[in-house]
């Protein structure tokens, strides 16, 4: 009988080899679990980091949208909302005014909102505006605008590009992401119809002498009120009552 080598077990295997086999086995199991997880992933799971996705359903769910309009087109009061959804300076102003008006007066059919993308920079358009417009073509423009506003901190940490906007689009329930991407990519092409529409929105702001801050143009049976410089909810509500 040959003597047992101290570097081997009685069965002839090396201890180190056993550990290698165990580690490889564990890695294979982990890989298999990962593949199964990806294949069974529910739609939207990869977008868990998007802030406000659940809120969009509560605020905007069931409210009619058509292009830039949110609410009933026969609503007696119309509010043109001039906003730069990329501007972190006026994040709170947007969140303090739009959701309350939507959940109360827009949902009840008393008010309709029209979204006007208004850049607070030297450029007439911004990349997020194209994301809003692409979503609006499916009737989800307001959800996209809301998510852009809610996720401005994340946009500042990461690069605000098509990939980031695609993440926001993926968090909007029932919106066709493939169609959104096609519309977005077509829209950002120079000279596109979407670009012309955004330029027209900027021209309208200039025509109405909207200053470099969020504004509301409130129109109703009793006239029009123009609210400048990031008006709060109280000022907006007062204007609604004035023109109603």
Indicate residue ranges for each PLM-predicted region.
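A short beta-strand-turn-helix
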Residues: 60-77
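Alpha-helical scaffolding within the catalytic cores
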Residues: 64-65, 98-100, 203
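C-terminal cap of thioredoxin/glutaredoxin-like
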Residues: 1-40, 170-244
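Conserved strand-loop elements at the edges of beta-sheets that form or border functional pockets
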Residues: 72, 81, 229-230
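Short secondary-structure boundary/capping segments
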Residues: 69-71, 103, 207-208
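Ser/Thr/Pro/Gly-rich low-complexity linker/stalk segments immediately outside membranes or between
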Residues: 40-55
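Structural alpha/beta surface segment adjacent to cysteine/selenocysteine redox centers
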Residues: 75, 80-170
